[in-house]
From Swiss-Prot:
Species annotation: Pinus contorta (Shore pine)
UniProt domain comment: The Asp-Asp-Xaa-Xaa-Asp/Glu (DDXXD/E) motif is important for the catalytic activity, presumably through binding to Mg(2+).
Keyword flag Plastid: yes
Assigned protein family: Belongs to the terpene synthase family. Tpsd subfamily.
Gene name linked to the record: TPS-(+)Apin1
GO biological process: alpha-pinene metabolic process; diterpenoid biosynthetic process; green leaf volatile biosynthetic process; terpenoid biosynthetic process
Protein name: (+)-alpha pinene synthase 1, chloroplastic
């Protein structure tokens, strides 16, 4: 957080220029930043990996300010407004509903004696394959009852050695056991990872044949997927991940380009914690049906694929309307005039759409996009643009939580403050209608804590103080903002979240503490160099180096990444532990938001440099449809 001291604050500060006048003066400054926006015709985007250094500037009020040189909004609002789709027609919804009925009939066949899914030599694997397929194709919300019935059947035959392909197979099967371990664990069933011990040789090692067949490769691929759902202390899962990763990388060097190789590359790259459901669905639609090792009737595969494509494209038509609504909101609040800040509202909305594809969850998607965008504006104010005196005023205004507080704010802050005040109150009131308790006060307290963490960092920078690692992390878990990006959108989802249950997900729960710590640490490993270049010394890496004199920067980064890995296993346990008293589906919302930000920091600070991976994500998941 780079701060500069301003001239002594006086009453004239409350009589600054209007937001738009102030913004106009900044346009000359902003012109030095590369223009990466989508062209008016919406035909191209010019991505850039470069970031200009922080620049000191002086305005007519004599206050030196700094801007970080972030690239501009990538998505021209006219292009968003012109997004078109033919899938709004009722005929597509009617067709999808018809196919849903047909797929339900396929699930029903599982209970028919000697049916296609009930052979005693393959019924368990058939059921697991069906559940896994509808989940990866993004259509599982239509089949909750059928999924539960299928998994109950599989679990009834689960043993300490795993399962075979069928209830009468007699021999355990790696593919079925690995897929079962993963799927059952994710649905809250108690299953031990020790089942994998039975697939090691006498030396305690996983082995493979000299000739890697497609069937064996798929066995190991499911072993890899299972190994990622690891709990703390599960050495067998660590060994399985190491073995399967090595095996699959070796296989990629030998097999020709195919749907299988594409799937392997995708899963090795994104694993589980950076794998967003709609992103995986888009990949899986392309490769589904190419598995020739498992005898499933062609018609069943075609029905699942048809439904997946229909649902993907129908949801696309809803996304179009929601994005247009979000863009209007962005313009109505004057955000385009704030030219010193990042504008990532389209990207944030896309990330929400990638984890919440139920049409009923529009308030969640839009709420996440709005809150995340406003946090980004505040981040750029507190990090670079605001003076210490102005930040004290803004912090005091948030503590008052009153529109009259803007009277003593610089005008460039007034619009931002009112946007936060209006939108958080509006979301909280809507959530209160759903939840039946005072969510407005709850939201206000969470924002006070968030802003308090921001000003604490500002004071550290202003005084030149570098905190200890523990001191930094405790504050950083709050200043990252993941709690407030989760809280209000989650309360609008329609299911009851009484305070008793919410406290198991939100602050001060272990679950919340883990998600906030993971994101703060992961974010810092990608941001600390750019932050340091702007004079923002405090980061998890720098503070760890302070606490451990003589350690190299590379080793410090490795240590922080190791912490993230360990905390991630703890988070897996908090999500899936059977004795929590909170449904997994409730915690999964907060967990998926953690995955969203984890994805954003996978390669770099993807929220500052959004012109590479996240730009491609927007294109693949919300701009383009899939051919039927």
């Amino acid at each position: 957080m780079a701060l500069v001291s301003a001239v002594p604050l006086n009453s004239k500060l409350c009589l600054c220029r209007t937001l738009f006048g102030f913004s106009h003066e900044l346009k000359a400054i902003h012109s030095t930043v590369p223009n990466l926006g989508m062209c008016r015709g919406g035909k191209s985007i010019a991505p850039s990996m470069s970031m200009s250094s922080t620049t000191s500037v002086s305005n007519e009020d004599g206050v030196p300010r700094r801007i970080a040189g972030h690239h501009s909004n990538l998505w021209d609002d006219d292009s968003i407004a012109s997004l078109s789709t033919s899938y709004e027609a009722p005929s597509y919804r009617e067709r999808a509903d018809r196919v849903i009925g047909e797929v339900k009939n396929i699930f029903d066949l599982m209970s028919v004696e000697d049916g296609v899914f009930t052979s005693p030599l393959s019924d368990l694997h058939h059921r697991l394959w069906m559940v896994d397929s509808v989940e990866r194709l993004g259509i599982d919300r239509h089949f909750k009852h059928e999924i539960n019935s299928a998994l109950d059947h599989v679990y009834s035959y689960w043993t300490e050695k795993g399962i075979g392909r069928g209830r009468e197979s007699g021999v355990t099967d790696l593919n079925s056991t690995a897929l079962g371990l993963r799927t059952l664990r994710l649905h809250g069933y108690t299953v031990s990872s020790h089942v994998l011990d039975h697939f090691k040789n006498e030396k305690g090692q996983f082995t493979w044949s000299a000739i890697q067949t497609e069937g064996e490769i798929r066995d190991v691929l499911n072993l890899f997927r299972a190994s990622l759902i690891a709990f703390p202390g599960e050495k067998i899962m660590e060994a399985a991940e190491i073995f399967s990763t090595m095996y699959l990388k070796d296989a990629l060097q030998k097999i020709p380009p195919s749907g299988l190789s594409q799937e392997i590359e995708y899963l090795l790259e994104f694993g589980w914690h950076t794998n967003l459901p709609r992103m995986e669905t888009r990949m899986y639609i392309d490769v589904f049906g190419e598995d020739t090792t498992f005898e499933t009737p062609y018609l069943i595969r075609e029905k699942l694929l048809e439904l997946a494509k229909l649902e993907f494209n129908i949801f696309h038509s809803l996304v179009k309307r929601e994005l247009q609504s979000l863009t209007r909101w962005w313009k109505d609040y004057g955000f385009p005039e704030i030219t010193f800040s990042r504008h990532r509202h389209v990207e944030y909305y896309t990330l929400a759409a990638c984890i919440a594809n139920d049409p009923k969850h529009s308030a969640f998607r839009l709420g996440f996009g709005k809150i995340s965008h406003m946090i980004t504006i505040l981040d750029d104010i507190y990090d670079t643009f605001g003076t210490m005196e102005e930040l004290e005023l803004l912090t005091a205004a948030f503590k008052r939580w009153d529109p009259s507080s803007i009277e003593c704010l610089p005008d460039y802050m007034k619009g931002v403050y009112m946007a936060v005040y209006d939108n958080i109150n509006e979301m909280a009131r809507e959530a209160q209608k759903i939840q039946g308790w005072d969510t407005v006060s709850y939201a206000r307290k969470s924002w006070e804590a968030f802003i308090g963490a921001y000003i604490q960092e500002a004071k550290w920078i202003s005084s030149g103080y570098l905190p200890t690692f523990d001191e930094y992390l405790e504050n950083g878990k709050v200043s990252f903002g993941s709690r407030i990006t989760t809280l209000e959108p989650m309360l609008t989802l329609g299911f009851p979240l009484p305070p008793r249950i919410l406290q198991e997900i939100d602050f001060p729960s272990k679950f919340n503490d883990l998600t906030c710590a993971i994101l703060r640490l992961k974010g810092d490993t990608q941001c600390y160099k750019a932050d340091r270049a702007r004079g923002e010394e405090a980061s998890a890496v720098s503070c760890y180096m302070k606490d451990h004199p003589g350690i190299t920067e590379e080793d410090a980064v490795n240590q922080v990444n190791a912490m993230v890995d360990n905390l991630t296993k703890e988070l897996n346990w908090e999500l899936l532990r059977p004795d929590s008293g909170v449904p997994i589906s409730y915690k999964k919302v907060a967990f998926d938001i953690c995955r969203v930000f984890h994805y954003g920091y996978k390669y770099r600070d993807g929220f500052s440099v959004a012109s590479v991976e996240i730009k491609n994500l927007v294109t693949r998941t919300v701009v383009e449809t899939v051919p039927l």
